[in-house]
A protein has these predicted regions:
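Histidine-centered active-site microenvironments of extracellular/periplasmic hydrolases
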Residues: 58, 292-322
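Active-site-proximal N-terminal segment of extracellular/periplasmic enzymes that hydrolyze or transfer
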Residues: 24-100
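Metal-dependent active-site segment of extracytoplasmic phospho-/sulfohydrolases and closely related
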Residues: 34-36, 44, 265-305, 347
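Active-site His/acidic residue clusters
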Residues: 180-182, 226-272
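Acidic, His- and aromatic-enriched active-site or binding-groove loops in soluble protein domains
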Residues: 129-144, 184-220
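Bacterial N-terminal signal peptides
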Residues: 8-18
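Non-catalytic, well-ordered alpha-helical segments in soluble enzyme domains
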Residues: 151, 155-157, 325, 334-367
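Long, well-ordered early-domain segments
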Residues: 72-178
Length: 367
């Protein structure tokens, strides 16, 4: 009898331990969602000051007048605050009324890259790992990430199906960047067809293949946005990453007019996504949005097209937040310097996952 009672007690103990472990893995408010959005190579100058008139003037062709350019008429205003609101009206309403943004150095707030390379793959890997790996991640080649990313860990810790952790990216190399184990999460990057039950989205698949961009392995951001929204509506992910690319592509091409237009389009994408999320009961008041960039660019008319370790300014980034569990502080002022390495832990913390327990060297979460 004692043996049977002992076995029963031991079994109850094991069940209790199992429940505690399960609770630890699932310790997140039901329905909470994190959304990460990146704007490739988006300079602090445009984010905080809108149109840079010196750079626009440097792109004038013979016979052109600055005041006659369509983008000047559309985006110019006397003050940086007015110009940035003309460029990204929704974004600035969101971060000033419902969130915050760090990185305006004029106000004593800075965000820095931790990696030494100051270009895309190292920057994105730093975002998703919470730490730089300069010796191993030192090119933009499509090489599988040697480390497990925060996206993969969130899927495992929250016991989610792969389609509940999804990445939509304009650049094809995100297939390798976001996963150490191929297929661990859902990834749609570059000119990949979207698998969806929605017949209206099926029309996008041949269209994005036919609408070739000037850049190899990259689709236009409009397709990335539509694909992400289709997946959001049909699969209802808990972790979503949307990576836009045109803010970098047009800069490399020296098309400052197109660059400004891409900022403005991205603002409409953010608006449409945020408004849709807030219209859905399962996402309203439960969605944690973080917006940032993988690197900065040069400060001047001679180097704004470029980035990399030799370009001063390319290490300067910014981070914006809209979260029900973060203070609504608008622009950060006179604050300690933040690092891009803190993004991974910040995302994980919103789902009550301790990323620093997984990667002790990673940056700490931002609160």
């Amino acid at each position: 009898m004692k043996s049977r009672l002992g076995l029963l007690a031991f079994g109850t103990f094991l069940l209790g331990i199992g429940a505690m472990i399960h609770a630890g893995r699932q310790a997140v408010p039901a329905g909470d969602t994190v959304v990460l959005v990146t704007l490739d190579g988006a300079r602090t100058e445009e984010m905080f000051g809108g149109l840079d008139v010196d750079i626009l003037a440097s792109t004038l062709k013979a016979g052109q007048k600055l005041e006659e350019l369509p983008v000047y008429k559309r985006f110019w205003a006397p003050s940086p605050e007015e110009r940035r609101r003309k460029l990204m009206p929704f974004f600035w309403t969101l971060v000033t009324e419902q969130g915050s943004i760090a990185g305006n150095r004029r106000l004593g707030s800075a965000v820095q890259l931790g990696n030494a390379h100051w270009f895309s793959y190292p920057g994105y890997s730093e975002i998703l790992l919470g730490e730089p790996h300069d010796a191993e991640i030192k090119s933009n080649d499509p090489i599988r990430n040697p480390y497990v990313t925060v996206l993969e860990t969130l899927r495992e810790r929250l016991s989610l199906p792969s389609d509940k952790v999804a990445t939509f990216a304009s650049w094809s190399v995100f297939n390798e960047i976001v996963e150490h184990t191929e297929g661990a999460t859902y990834v749609n990057a570059g000119v990949e067809p979207l698998e969806t039950p929605r017949t209206d989205i099926h029309l996008l698949n041949p269209l994005q293949a036919e609408a070739a961009t000037p850049w190899d392995g990259t689709r236009f951001d409009a397709f990335t946005f539509r694909a992400a929204m289709a997946h959001l509506a049909s699969a209802r992910p808990r972790v979503l990453y949307v990576a836009y690319d045109e803010t970098d592509d047009w800069a490399h091409d020296g098309r400052y007019d197109r660059l400004l237009e891409s900022f403005a389009r991205t603002d409409t994408y953010l608006k449409d996504m945020w408004n849709w999320l807030q219209s859905q009961p399962e996402y309203r008041g439960r969605t944690h949005l973080l917006i940032t960039t993988d690197h900065g660019r040069g400060h001047t008319a001679s180097d704004w097209r470029d980035h990399g370790a030799k370009i001063e300014g390319a290490q300067e980034t910014w981070i914006a937040f809209a979260s029900p569990r973060m203070p609504r502080r608008g622009e950060w002022r006179n604050a300690p310097t933040l690092s891009t390495s803190q993004v991974a832990a910040t995302l994980a913390s919103r789902m009550n996952v301790d990323w620093n327990a997984e990667r002790p060297r990673a940056g700490r979460p931002i609160h």
